[in-house]
Amino acid sequence: MLAIRTVIAISAAVIALLGCGSGTGRDAPSDASAAGSPAPTQSASSANWTLGGVPCALIPVPAAAPLGIGTCPGVRPGAIVLSDVGQCTLNFLFLGSDGYSYIGTAGHCILGTSPFGGDAGEMAWDPGTGPVARDAGGNPIGEFAYAILQDPKDFSLIRLDPSVQASAGMCHFGGPTAVNDDNPGITEPVVLNWFGNGVGVGAVLPARSAVAAGMPSPDHVFAQGAAAPGDSGSGVISSDGRAVGVLVTVGVHTASVGSGGLDAGMIGMTRLTPQVERAKAVLGVDLVLQVAPAQ
């Protein structure tokens, strides 16, 4: 047992030092390249963002896939969302004190990424003024109300149209049953689950898991797992069904794994609570996470 814990501790130390910027990587595309061409292979030193101060590459946002696809139907955690930037994945559902329902995805799914890298700032939109969000079939589901891409936050909220029937339950895994704000140390591994829509792998491996060697930071988590373009925004839950955060970055890339360039290695997640608290302050709206039984 001591030997196992020592290996975990060493692995965690490597993650802390290298984070999602280790190894060889591809940058996420700029808004222009998101419309089609795959990003070139580059060294991770050209990562286009930082998470917790560690150089990272945001998960690429691919151009919208053919309408009607999707392995997680409806408007719920794990379903496809289409924006002006491209295709991403929805995370958690919230009820606002203003009477609207809101559902999340990643901030870079609407703010895009700068060709020069770095933060893209923070924006909020009044009802009726935000960019339109659509489901996998191209149907409008609402408008973006809030978005931030500013280390260590990468989060956005869609203000759902009152006619949209949304579900709180994550495809395959169920939940979230509550919020997970735990901060286990680096010798306490945590299994994390999400349902994504990675292009090339989403139809085959939409439900995936990763292992984090602890979650000591209240703002972000690094874990050993795999992600692909289109997974951006996926809600991440712990094995007991509680909401941990949002999948946003990749680091070590192995394009030969699977098809469509599955990114295997260190992945990065932003913790949920700090981002929701910031959104509440900016919007002036209280937001309550909607829960569902774990499966």
Language-model-derived ranges and their functions:
Residues 1-8:
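Bacterial N-terminal signal peptides that target proteins for export
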Residues 9-14:
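Hydrophobic helical h-region of N-terminal Sec-dependent signal peptides
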Residues 20-104, 113-135, 140-146, 289-295:
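Protease-domain processing segments flanking chymotrypsin-fold serine proteases, especially trypsin-like
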Residues 82-213, 238-239:
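Serine endopeptidase catalytic core focused on the charge-relay Asp
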Residues 106-111, 197, 229, 245-254:
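Short beta->alpha transition motifs characteristic of CBS
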Residues 160-177, 248-295:
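C-terminal cap/linker of serine protease catalytic domains
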Residues 225-247, 256:
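Catalytic nucleophile loop of clan PA
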